[in-house]
């Protein structure tokens, strides 16, 4: 495998949230999550993976399975070990740009995500994904 480069850039969206994969190796994936203010995801964990998130813009509040908050502002991050249940919300007054690093332990796990109700996801987000919104043509968030 060769070295590769990437840019922290993602389209603006009209609502909801998006995820754009930036690069990957056999044991690591990196991506950029983009959430409009107020948007959150569901309580979940990642078997076989540790995750790191760094706030590039906006504000994120991460919650553990007991719903205890940890507020992160621009330039702050959190590391989440395998089997740690969490969810997060864009809690600032501007969209949240969140750099994500996923490190796999050993070979690729068969189950990539499990929510609090036991629902499992086995497919990896390898394409640009927008949930509950549309991209805004010609408008982008990027690290400057």
Listing of model-derived features with the role each one plays in the protein:
Residues 34-36, 45-62, 101-104:
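Short, conserved beta-strand element in jelly-roll/cupin
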Residues 52, 79, 93-110:
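A short hydrophobic beta-strand segment most commonly corresponding to one strand
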Residues 88-91:
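Asparagine-centered strand-capping/turn motif at beta-strand->loop junctions
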Residues 26-27, 48, 67, 93-94:
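Short strand-connecting beta-turns/loops that link adjacent beta-strands
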Residues 1-32, 42-43, 113-144:
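A short, N-terminal "cap"/entry segment at the start of jelly-roll beta-barrel domains
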